[in-house]
Amino acid sequence: MPRPTGKKFDKRRQQQNPLFKRKKFCRFTAAGVEQIDYKDIDTLKDFIGENGKITPARLTGTKAHYQRQLDTAIKRARFLALMPYTDQHKA
């Protein structure tokens, strides 16, 4: 049986593709941030996964300069007990 082809099929296939890549951009460059602050916990939480790991720049689209600052800010916030090192523990 031949595979379905045509304009309609291609459009539907693109919409259903779970790996469809959206154009990534650096949030910090767009906002004009010069320095990432370790006290801004709400921003830092966006860059930490469910398991407590720092999300890599290739997934978030953050530029290398800001990714290094982000890494340092998260580590400082963890050291000062502003953020947890791991996810929520189930007792």
UniProtKB/Swiss-Prot annotation:
GO molecular function, a single term: small ribosomal subunit rRNA binding
Keywords associated with the record: Ribonucleoprotein, Ribosomal protein, RNA-binding, rRNA-binding
GO biological process: translation
Cysteine disulfide partners in this protein: none
InterPro entries reported in the protein's UniProt record: Ribosomal_bS18, Ribosomal_bS18_CS, Ribosomal_bS18_sf
Source species, domain of life: Bacteria
SUPFAM superfamilies: Ribosomal protein S18
Keyword Ligase assigned: no
A single Gene Ontology CC term: cytosolic small ribosomal subunit
Family statement: Belongs to the bacterial ribosomal protein bS18 family.
Biological role: Binds as a heterodimer with protein bS6 to the central domain of the 16S rRNA, where it helps stabilize the platform of the 30S subunit.
Assembly and oligomerization: Part of the 30S ribosomal subunit. Forms a tight heterodimer with protein bS6.
Protein's name in the database: Small ribosomal subunit protein bS18
Organism, scientific name: Paraburkholderia phymatum (strain DSM 17167 / CIP 108236 / LMG 21445 / STM815) (Burkholderia phymatum)
Gene (UniProt): rpsR
